[in-house]
C-alpha cells in the first residue's frame, strides 16, 4: 500500500463552543461542524497539521 492510499477517518467528538476562531475555522476546513460527524481524508502532512490544531475535539482512526 503506497502513501497515497492511506486515509484517516476524523470524527468530531466535542463541540466548538468556547474554542478559538482558528480552531473553529479548522473544523470547518476539515468538513466537520457538529459532534459525531465523520469525514475520510487522505493521510498527508496537511491533514495531520489540521488534526493537531483540533486534537482535543476529534477522534482519529487510521485506515
Curated annotation (Swiss-Prot):
One of its GO terms (molecular function) is structural constituent of ribosome. GO terms for biological process: translation. CDD domains: Ribosomal_L30. Keywords: Ribonucleoprotein, Ribosomal protein. InterPro entries: Ribo_uL30_ferredoxin-like_sf, Ribosomal_uL30_bac-type, Ribosomal_uL30_ferredoxin-like. It holds the Pfam family Ribosomal_L30. SUPFAM superfamilies: Ribosomal protein L30p/L7e. GO terms for cellular component: cytosolic large ribosomal subunit. Belongs to the universal ribosomal protein uL30 family. Part of the 50S ribosomal subunit. This is Large ribosomal subunit protein uL30. It comes from Chlorobium chlorochromatii (strain CaD3). The lineage of its organism: Bacteria, Pseudomonadati, Chlorobiota, Chlorobiia, Chlorobiales.
Amino acid at each position: 500500500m503506497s502513501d497515497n492510499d492511506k486515509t484517516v477517518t476524523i470524527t468530531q467528538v466535542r463541540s466548538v463552543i468556547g474554542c478559538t476562531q482558528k480552531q473553529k475555522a479548522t473544523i470547518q476546513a476539515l468538513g466537520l461542524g457538529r459532534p459525531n460527524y465523520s469525514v475520510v481524508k487522505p493521510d498527508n502532512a496537511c491533514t495531520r497539521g489540521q488534526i493537531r490544531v483540533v486534537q482535543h475535539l476529534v477522534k482519529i482512526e487510521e485506515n
